[in-house]
Swiss-Prot record:
The keyword Cell inner membrane appears for this protein: yes
Name the UniProt record assigns to this protein: Biosynthetic peptidoglycan transglycosylase
Entry-linked InterPro entries: Glyco_trans_51 (IPR001264), Lysozyme-like_dom_sf (IPR023346), PBP_transglycosylase (IPR036950), Pep_trsgly (IPR011812)
GO biological process, alphabetically ordered: cell wall organization; peptidoglycan biosynthetic process; regulation of cell shape
EC number of the protein: 2.4.99.28
Similarity comment: Belongs to the glycosyltransferase 51 family.
Biological pathway: Cell wall biogenesis; peptidoglycan biosynthesis
The species this protein was found in: Salmonella dublin (strain CT_02021853)
Gene name per UniProt: mtgA
Topology term for the membrane: Single-pass membrane protein
C-alpha cells in the first residue's frame, strides 16, 4: 500500500521538477535572446489577445512597434523613471526600502493595496508572466528580475520596458502610443506628452491619455516636477540610459 502511495507522489514530484526545469530553460533562453533581439510580443500582449478572441472581439489587435532607445525621446524614459522607479539606475532589481514601506502600508490599509515593483520587476512580469496577484507569480517574477538584471544593461531594461508597456486598450509600446495619441513618432514626444503617457501606466485600461481625468492631469504635473528634480535630460546621460 505504501509503495502505491509513494509512486504517484514521486511521479508528480519528478513531473513538477521537469516542468520547472523546462520553464527555466525557456525563460533563460528568452532573457539571453531578448538582450540583443527586439521583443516581438509579451506575455501580457498574448494574454490580452487571447482574452479578446475568447470574448468574441475578433477585431482586437494587441499592437506594438519596436523602436530603439535612439528613436525614443529622452523625456519618455525620464518620465517613466520619475513616475515608477526613481532609484532605477541604483538598485539591482528590487527597491527594498520601498517594499518595506508598502508592506507596512498594506498591513494598515488592506482595502488600499500599495505596490513597490521596480521597472525591472514590471518588465519581467509583463514580458514573461501572467496578470494577477499570487505568491507563485511573485516568486517567479523575483527570479526573472534577477535574471534580466544580471544579463541586461539598465538601458536595455528601460528599452524593453518602454516597448512592451501597455498604454491603452490594444496599445503596447511607446511608439504605438505616440502615434495613436499624438500623431507623431516616439522620438518627438515633448516633456508634457511623455509625462501624460507615464501618468496612465498604473492602470492604462482605466486612465486614458486621450481623455485624461483630473487625477491623470495632477499626476502628469507631479511627474513633470519629479523630472525636473531628477535633473532633466542630464539624468539620462549621466546614467547612460539614452
Amino acid at each position: 500500500m505504501s509503495k502505491r502511495r509513494i509512486a504517484p507522489l514521486t511521479f508528480l514530484r519528478r513531473l513538477l521538477l521537469r516542468i520547472l526545469a523546462a520553464l527555466a530553460v525557456f525563460w533563460g533562453g528568452g532573457i539571453a535572446l531578448f538582450s540583443v533581439v527586439p521583443v516581438p510580443f509579451s506575455a501580457v500582449m498574448a494574454e490580452r489577445q487571447i482574452s479578446a478572441w475568447l470574448g468574441g472581439e475578433f477585431g482586437y489587435v494587441a499592437h506594438s512597434d519596436w523602436v530603439s532607445m535612439a528613436d525614443i525621446s529622452p523625456w519618455m524614459g525620464l518620465a517613466v523613471i520619475a513616475a515608477e522607479d526613481q532609484k532605477f539606475p541604483e538598485h539591482w532589481g528590487f527597491d527594498v526600502p520601498a517594499i518595506e514601506k508598502a508592506l507596512a502600508h498594506n498591513e494598515r490599509n488592506e482595502s488600499r493595496i500599495r505596490g513597490a515593483s521596480t521597472l525591472s520587476q514590471q518588465t519581467a512580469k509583463n514580458l514573461f508572466l501572467w496578470d494577477g496577484r499570487s505568491w507563485l507569480r511573485k516568486g517567479l517574477e523575483a527570479g526573472l528580475t534577477l535574471g534580466i538584471e544580471t544579463v541586461w544593461s539598465k538601458k536595455r531594461i528601460l528599452t524593453v520596458s518602454l516597448n512592451i508597456a501597455e498604454f491603452g486598450d490594444g496599445i503596447f509600446g511607446v511608439e504605438a502610443a505616440a502615434q495613436r495619441y499624438f500623431h507623431k513618432p516616439a522620438s518627438r514626444l515633448s516633456v508634457s506628452e511623455a509625462a501624460l503617457l507615464a501618468a496612465v501606466l498604473p492602470n492604462p485600461l482605466r486612465y486614458k491619455a486621450n481623455a485624461p481625468s483630473g487625477y491623470v492631469r495632477s499626476r502628469q504635473a507631479w511627474i513633470m516636477r519629479q523630472m525636473r528634480q531628477l535633473g532633466g535630460e542630464s539624468f539620462m546621460t549621466r546614467n547612460q540610459l539614452n
